[in-house]
Each structure stands twice: as structure tokens, then as C-alpha cells.
């Protein structure tokens, strides 16, 4: 009778090979999950920056167009990663330090800020204060009004 070619103990080494493959696969799962979470956070930060720019640009367009003009914009700050929206601070009292800014506060304490300049605009809520928003998805109504010979952009969540 002929002997099979190759290693006679090949069958005995299969469990060892399977254990090695399982160990390598297990060690690569955590870095892959961390890479995915990092990608989700970067994608959220990029989308958040674009939406903050949209708020500021809309306020600037309304300032140039003048009183009586209105725009409605949809915002979506939803995130699947660990980085999440805490709140959005829009404008402030006319003439105040934050009257031309939009700030996004993240759950880790970081703040993204956009300032409306060139042209500068005064952005506030209907009560003439800053607007604080907590929703991750919302619709904003922005209207240009004349107040004491100054064009203000009134922002409210719908």
C-alpha cells in the first residue's frame, strides 16, 4: 500500500491553524471598529461644519436682500458615532459679542464656531436674545426685519 504524499500529521495541525486564524481575526476586530467610529465622527464633523456655514450664509444673504425676506432651511445633526450634538447657540442680543455667531457645542465639550462677517449680520431669536437649540434635526425659519434702523435676522425653530 502506498503512503499519501505530504505531511502525515497534517490533520493534527488543523486545530492549531484554526486557533491562530481566530486569534488574528479577534485582534483585528477592535482596530477596525475604532477606525469605523473615527470615520463616523469625522463625517459628522464635516456635515456639521457645512450646516453651520449654511446658517451663516443664509443670514448674510438675507442681510443683503433686506427686510421682508424670509428663508427656511432644514438641518440634520444626527450622528451614528460617539461625537454628538449637545446644543446649537444661534446669535445673541443685537450689538452683543455673539450676535453674529453660530456655535455648535458637542457632547465632548468642543465648540465649532462660525461668524457672519463680510457682510456682518445681527442674528437673534424673536425675543431679541440668542437662540438655543437642542434638536439634532430641525427646520429653521430665518427672516430679515428692520429694528431701530438696523437689519436683524430673526431665527426660530419650526
Model-derived regions, located:
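A generic structural micro-environment signature
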Residues: 17-22, 42-45, 68-69, 81-83, ...
Amino acid at each position: 500500500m502506498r503512503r499519501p504524499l505530504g505531511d502525515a500529521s497534517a490533520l493534527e495541525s488543523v486545530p492549531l491553524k484554526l486557533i491562530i486564524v481566530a486569534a488574528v481575526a479577534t485582534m483585528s476586530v477592535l482596530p477596525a471598529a475604532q477606525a469605523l467610529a473615527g470615520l463616523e465622527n469625522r463625517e459628522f464633523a464635516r456635515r456639521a461644519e457645512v450646516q453651520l456655514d449654511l446658517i451663516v450664509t443664509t443670514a448674510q444673504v438675507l442681510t443683503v436682500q433686506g427686510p421682508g425676506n424670509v428663508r427656511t432651511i432644514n438641518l440634520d445633526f444626527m450622528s451614528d458615532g460617539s461625537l454628538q450634538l449637545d446644543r446649537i447657540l444661534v446669535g445673541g442680543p443685537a450689538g452683543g459679542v455673539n450676535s453674529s455667531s453660530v456655535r455648535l457645542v458637542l457632547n465632548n465639550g468642543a465648540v465649532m464656531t462660525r461668524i457672519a462677517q463680510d457682510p456682518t449680520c445681527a442674528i437673534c431669536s424673536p425675543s431679541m436674545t440668542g437662540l438655543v437649540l437642542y434638536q439634532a434635526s430641525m427646520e429653521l425659519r430665518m427672516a430679515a426685519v428692520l429694528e431701530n434702523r438696523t437689519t436683524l435676522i430673526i431665527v426660530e425653530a419650526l
